[in-house]
């Protein structure tokens, strides 16, 4: 595909990195010549220096014959204008835009539709991150929770702990422990390295285990890998920006929520907007404030300011003072690997959430959902099996007979309303939704090719 990426920031650059190795023709546009030079030195792509929404710049980038335009500059207005220009002047067929402002998002149904601003797919990072954190709170102890096929099946990452019934046992014992629940371990990472899960594989404490199950069975499977934690009740949020405010609004009906905001005017506004959240104006690094608000009784402390260092330090302080779990929002990708797994329980990257959403729209038509995992090194993919036995490499074939790319595991199949956990004898049928885990994202193009029907396939 010929894809134009507008914006060479962290998201634009990471998206280009993901797509360049998949036989795509990538052009990236930005007004920062140094950043463009840096990307061109690293990857096989074209660059255009200029303003992303200007017609002459888009023409130079090849909007007239591009398959897709992805607008991820730092300003919503530029992204919207670029989509409008690409549609009106160049008839670029697929247009994706990142929009952050809650004022635009509040009117998205009216603004982004046929006959209005021509954005085919809207990416709202703050909404994605809010939903992601909400899922983690719903499943105490989970490191990642990703849902597929309209929430019917989920891929969950947990850390195996001493005391979990399966820890120290082989994977084959999973069915003995849960005879009425079907699940599949898609991957195990031990000390950061992937292990191919087999029936004889012994689960060790501190293993990062990715399993696939019907969404209503997640808690049961988690209880086999770690001591099942009690549902969270008390939550403290630091930072009353878009994400913090949105998260508090979603949680306040079912949890006891406190929010700390440093800016007095913002705190005052939030106290009026939020019905059941207690809002404080103060510094989350203030030990006296945390002590007064009973930090030792908090189930989850979530730091969501715009400053990585503030989030990390306040979370470390909260953990030391007794908070049971701490989560932090991290903008810099390099920090995520450094902090998660120690004092910090979960590090959340808005860039990875955005990349996952973008890849879902950029992948070929048979790929309907993508989640970037393990800080972008791995991926979970939902693909639809199209074609028949004469045109497809997967339809009508048992999973054990399909030659999958290295490190690829089929975890589940969703057939209509039915969730089928994948086993070697499971046969894929036309229109099945197939959920896969890829230990290494470099094999994504091989998976795409596997699911593309071909009239020449015999």
UniProtKB/Swiss-Prot annotation:
Q: Where does NAD(+) 2 bind?
A: 234-262
> What InterPro entries does the record tag this protein with?
K_uptake_TrkA, NAD(P)-bd_dom_sf, RCK_C, RCK_C_sf, RCK_N, Trk_Ktr_HKT_K-transport
PROSITE patterns associated with the record: RCK_C, RCK_N
Extract the Gene3D superfamilies matched here. NAD(P)-binding Rossmann-like Domain, Regulator of K+ conductance, C-terminal domain
The record describes its membrane topology as: Peripheral membrane protein
Cell compartment(s), UniProt: Cell inner membrane
Domain named RCK C-terminal is located at 143-227, 368-453
User: Corresponding gene?
Assistant: trkA
What domain notes does the record hold?
The RCK N-terminal domain binds NAD and possibly other effectors. This is expected to cause a conformation change that regulates potassium transport.
- The organism's superkingdom is given as Bacteria
Under PANTHER family, the record lists: POTASSIUM CHANNEL PROTEIN 2-RELATED-RELATED (PTHR43833), TRK SYSTEM POTASSIUM UPTAKE PROTEIN TRKA (PTHR43833:SF5)
**Species classification:** Bacteria, Pseudomonadati, Pseudomonadota, Gammaproteobacteria, Vibrionales
Protein name in the entry: Trk system potassium uptake protein TrkA
Q: Where is the RCK N-terminal domain?
A: 1-123, 232-348
What is the recorded function of this protein according to its Swiss-Prot or TrEMBL entry?
Answer: Part of a potassium transport system.
Q: Which UniProt keywords apply?
A: Cell inner membrane, Cell membrane, Ion transport, Membrane, NAD, Potassium, Potassium transport, Repeat, Transport
Residues reported to bind NAD(+) 1: 7-11, 30, 73-74, 98
SUPFAM superfamilies linked: NAD(P)-binding Rossmann-fold domains (SSF51735), TrkA C-terminal domain-like (SSF116726)
Mind telling me which NCBIfam families this protein's record contains? PRK09496.1-1 (NF007030), PRK09496.1-2 (NF007031), PRK09496.1-4 (NF007032), PRK09496.3-2 (NF007039)
Identify one Gene Ontology CC term for this UniProt entry. Answer: plasma membrane
Give GO terms: molecular function aspect only.
potassium ion transmembrane transporter activity
